[in-house]
Amino acid sequence: MSKLLVVVDYQNDFVNGALGFEQAAALEDPILNRVQTALNDGWKVIFTRDTHSEDYLNTREGQFLPVPHCIENTSGWHLYGKLAQYESESCPNMMFVNKPTFGSEELPHAACTLCGGEPEAIELCGVVTNICVVSNAILLHSAFLSSSVSILKDLCAAPNPEDHESTLRLLSGMGYGIV
């Protein structure tokens, strides 16, 4: 069985763009190191990309969060910093999932495809802990009842550290590993 690392939305707009925040920038090297280690150890890696179109403000999410961001194929949509190298690399153990909102209903199917079935273990990291990380963690936890699902707490961030911590407590209470 495969092990899976999911890097959630580590994109320019969440680090130094429209919705950027200081804590996100500090994650660049630690996330890069985790991705490199995972690939070297034979893990599968999925990068999610928040992906919107020009009509974002007319969507339900755009009404809730009226800040245009991660418009497909703009600079803000691409992975941030050193992680951007993976967008131009071809690797059989890696894939991208473009998602139109906080959580991706396609993520479990993508994980099965990449892993050749249900992953044995899943780790998540990225941003924003209390929005997209938690949404995708719950989708994966619900889809893979035999998989351990863990959040890499030091490789996730939210603009408000209290939101980050309260989300980790919530996930811990639902049986997720917080490592």
Regions inferred by a protein language model and the residue ranges of each:
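Active-site catalytic pocket residues across diverse enzymes, especially alpha/beta-hydrolases
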Residues: 87, 111, 115, 143-144
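Acidic, Mg2+-coordinating phosphoryl-transfer loop and its flanking beta/alpha structural elements
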Residues: 142-151
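Active-site acidic carboxylates
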Residues: 1-95, 116-117, 150, 159, ...
